[in-house]
């Protein structure tokens, strides 16, 4: 009588229970497959929601309208690891719509999406949000058309400029108004984008809004607390830094 070895016992078991083992292998494979699909699906939904939020608000953690603090001072606070700059030289005279341009960091933060066209790349080019076109009664304007706008510089004298439309943007600036104690028209993000050289107007001054990414470990409430002041009577004064609350609304307190 032959001695039974482990290999022979295993082989005999496989032959006897072949269908059961095949079913077990298929079951394990399907379980792994469905779990992988579920994980990928959840990840895809998360990424899609993140992309929609970025298109609506940008990916920055905070912003500061008309920020006069220097970048060196801001970085020395230890709160930030990236700063983008949005420059406002003027508003559109008839609709009070802010006109401006981004530096590369701000453009990367804001993730502007286009219904048609692209960003301005040279002097004389302009990109306009869809809602701004409606306010200016330029609904029929498309990429390649020319528009003549009266620009009111910040604390300056009106100038008339003609541009070629190179982009029609999805709406975003209205979502970034934030809380502000100021009522000036330029205290908004631009719905009209121009090339930086077009910001060289004869009069007025430039206003700069800043966008921030927080340094590792920094939370929104910590950044807000850094700028909060309490007087002798216990009254609190909040800073001009804006973060996003749980509903993605900008707030400075």
What do the predicted segments below correspond to?
Residues 1-33:
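N-terminal Sec/SRP start-transfer signal
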Residues 2, 37, 159:
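Conserved acidic
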Residues 31-42:
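Alpha-helical transmembrane segments
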